[in-house]
Amino acid sequence: WVLVVGLVILVMLTILAMALMKTARLEEKMAGATRDMNLSFQAAETALRRAENFIESQTAESIFDTTGEGVYNQETDEPANPFTSNWDDTDSKAIAGALEGVTSSPRYMIKKLKKIGESNLTITGYGDDDAPRPTVFRVTVRGTGGTNNRTTLLRSHYSKVF
């Protein structure tokens, strides 16, 4: 009788251990997916900062009058759907210097939209015909995580007075 009770307890412990192993494996996969998502978001944020720094570092607006290396002028359309874009050197710019843990370098596209404030009102609300008007840019970035299957796309608008 003791042998039967011992075997039943052993079978129950084995089933419990297998269920715990399955749960631990699932939690490990979820933690890996979360880490991968965080990496891709950090890569996209890095690309966004670099693209905005690129815009800010320009002293003349004329660099945005041509298209190439991730820059699109007003007349040239960037890829309509960033999800299906190739994100290669023909339509975007890669961030120099690799980030740790990501499989592909983050990339960005900058589209020059237009000058805002076409009227003679300035930010302060006072009329001034000679006030410089800011130019608005649409910045689209892509970051990947530990695998190319995990991507994050961000889009922002940035303005600068030249």
Task: Label each PLM-derived region with a short phrase.
Residues 1-6, 10-162:
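Terminal alpha-helical segments
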